[in-house]
From Swiss-Prot:
Subunit structure: Part of the 50S ribosomal subunit.
Keyword 4Fe-4S: no
GO biological process: negative regulation of translation; translation
Family per record: Belongs to the universal ribosomal protein uL13 family.
SUPFAM superfamilies attached to this UniProt entry: Ribosomal protein L13
Gene of this entry: rplM
Gene3D superfamilies in alphabetical order: Ribosomal protein L13 (3.90.1180.10)
GO molecular-function term, one example from the UniProt record: structural constituent of ribosome
Protein's recorded name: Large ribosomal subunit protein uL13
Organism for this UniProt entry: Aliarcobacter butzleri (strain RM4018)
A Gene Ontology cellular-component term: cytosolic large ribosomal subunit
Keyword Ribonucleoprotein belongs to the record: yes
Length: 139
């Protein structure tokens, strides 16, 4: 009788995947990236093991948005002090720091556990086409 093989953390082989965000819809990029970071595209996927790959997003500032999200969507921050709630429009965040916007959106699609935080560390986002990870990427 055969049993299901479970992946172990020391057996996982991680690849580096480059995603070019030029003229792609923001949400579709994020769902693709979250699937790769989680490892759900691999046959050895195990929910309690971080079996995802590293993802490098380049040209992050050239993505498109569907609908009127840039004007209508707001992000809230709070420092912990009374009355310190701040609201930022998505368009402001995308102009100032697109890397943070990608990380926030991807974090929302990953598990809210320590495993999810480890998965998010494997995401590298760059606004331009240059990145320092060319040595790790094959092909």
């Amino acid at each position: 009788m055969k049993f299901t093989q479970m992946a172990h953390a020391n057996e996982i082989k991680r690849d580096w995947i480059v995603v070019d965000a030029t003229d792609k819809v923001f949400g579709r990029i994020i769902t693709e990236v979250a699937t790769i970071l989680r490892g759900k595209n691999k046959p050895c996927f195990t929910p309690n093991v971080d079996c995802g790959d590293f993802v490098v997003i380049i040209n992050a500032s050239k993505a498109k948005f569907s609908g009127k999200k840039l004007e209508s969507k707001n992000y809230f921050t709070h420092s912990g002090y009374f009355g310190s709630t701040k609201t930022h429009k998505m368009s402001e965040m995308f102009e100032k720091n697109p890397e943070k916007l990608y990380k926030l959106a991807t974090r929302g699609m990953l598990p809210k556990t320590t495993l999810g935080k480890e998965m998010l560390k494997k995401l590298k986002v760059y606004a331009g086409s240059e990145h320092p990870h060319t040595a790790q990427i094959k092909g």
